[in-house]
Every structure is written in C-alpha cells, then in structure tokens.
C-alpha cells in the first residue's frame, strides 16, 4: 500500500498514479521512509506508540484531515485511550500559523496522559512544525533531559520533518486531483484561524527555559548575516558518527561515498534506513529529468521554500544550483536579499514562487488557482486539454513542483533544528 496515494485518494494505475511513477524512486522511497520511521524492525528506545503519537500530533498541527485521521487511527491501534486523548488535547493547544520567527514557544508538560518523554517530543515537534528557525541547542538539551538519546533525537527529527513533506504532497495531490482544498479543517483549525502568524494560542514565551545538557554541543560558528550567494558550512548540535565508527550499513545509507566527510550526513546516519530512503527520494525529485519541470525551476522552488522557512544553509546551496542550471543571477540574488515577495521577472517563476510559498504555509494555502497559474505560464503547457499528452506533461510539472517544495520543508527542518550554518573563513 502506498500511503501517499491512499491519503490523496489516488487510484492505482490512474492518471495521477502514472504521473507519480515518472519519479519512481521518489514514490518508492517516500513509502520506504514511512516504513523506516513508523514501522522499523528495531524501534530502539523510540517506541511504536511514541512514533504514532508524534505523527498524529504533527499531522494534526499541519491540518491536513486525511493525514490527521490516518495517524490517529494508527495510534488508536497501538496505544491506550489516554494517549490518544493527550494527542488531541495537545493538538488543540498547539494550533497556530507558520512559518514564523521569534515566535512564542508552546509547551506541553501538563498534558494529561503524556509522560516527560512524550511531552518533550511534542515541544520539539511544535517548534519544528511552526518556527524551526527559532531552534537553538537548548531544544536538544530539553529532549536529552527528558530521556532522549542522540539516536532517538535524530529519528524524532526525521519523523517530524518527513511528515512536513508527506502531508504537503498529500494536500498538493488532492488539489491536483480535484478533491478540494482539504487543509485547514483538522483539529485546531478554528483556533488557528483566530491566531496571527508567529503567535500561538497558549504560547508561553520566547524563552521556554530549556538548557543545554548531556551530549549537546554549542559549536563555535561565524553565523551568516542573512542569506548569502556563496557556500556555507554546517555544524551539528549533537555528535555525528565519527568516520572511523561508521558501520557498513551507515556508509551504504549515504548513497554517495563522498558524503562521509559531511558531519550532517554522518549525523543523519544515526538512523541509516531513514537516511537512505530520504536520500533516494531527494535524488529522484531533483535529478530525474524524465519529463516534468526543468532543473533550474526545481532549484528555484527549493530556494523559495528555504528563504521562507529561514534556512540560510539550504538557500545557499540551492540558489547556486538554480543559477548553474540557467537561472538569472540577478533575480536569484534579489530573492535572497528581499525575500519571497520580490519581483522574479517572469510569470512562470512568479507562479512557481506563489505555489511554493502557499504549500509551505501552515495551514496550507495551496489551491487550484496555483496549479492553473503554473500550467498557464509553463513553457509549452498553456491551453492543454484533459487526457492529452500535453495535459500529462502539465501534470508532471505540477507534481515536480509539489515534490520539490514539499521536500524542502523536510530538509529545512533538519538543517535548522539539528545544527547551524557556519561561514567559511574565505568568505568572512
């Protein structure tokens, strides 16, 4: 069973299933990531009940009803009624809008039925869902003080960040399939509608009282001043696996052997099955050029999402790739300097930007009008007729846009909450 197809209401062998199959490894490995994070053979200290509780909470916060109901059903099969009630109570409390920066923290220590580990996981999840740019090393210290070890923290971050991808793909495909604009109707949506972006019903303060603890690292970095058009380094807040300690399974999960030199990938290798599936998903979404969207526009979507979420590291990487693939240097610099509302110089790039921004917001603001605008502006995709080869191409462009935008809601959350960017000496 393909979970994304199920939640999006896509019939096996149907039109959208066939278009999704243009990115077969992305489709297969999105499912493999679900298995690695929700149904692993060895859960370690991160139990199935905890995984389902976090997933149900996160899906509820993202306000995509099909996903929220699915994960609540999984939780109900694996946990006691008091845990299900705790998730519902926490979801109602956490309702807000995002992405935000310098936002109030919402904490969940007093949720009935949630122990210290689960409450801390909810605290961390709320941060990742709505304002990951506000993460600091103390957020990981808070998890360690509640009993989470480094491996568990990486798996927890991967689970939350993966769901940020999955629910956006589901919502985008539902809109593409004409099943309505389903976001914003899950538990807590009414409360969220009454909260301005960057605030939260029940927000405690901008300082939740968390502390650096255990194995958490506060690295010495030269932080970038804003968004830059040169490369950046990145340093983790919990120890990466040392090169000499990498197991064959962890090395295999890197896919690209040269990534053993990256602390980021050696950190994610603490959960090798999730890393492998995530990497295969990434590579197929961005580098499989069998139809669909051109490479420059895929990288544009990644840069827009990273700019909106506040991820300077990801923006630095993908702005360069956008330009390398033919993107306009001046326009990309303007995006970095001025933000996502800047003039991008063409109807097509503006339509991509608008769709990527709408998909990134919580609750999602992505609707059929964004699809229509992309179709109308895409080269060779204007005035298509349903059921034609041109219509299939237009759908492939839209699915690439949905996948790229959704994936960077995954990538940004890992980069922003497990470590921080560092300006190389040559650029200081």
Residues of each region from the PLM?
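Hydrophobic alpha-helical segments
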Residues: 1-428
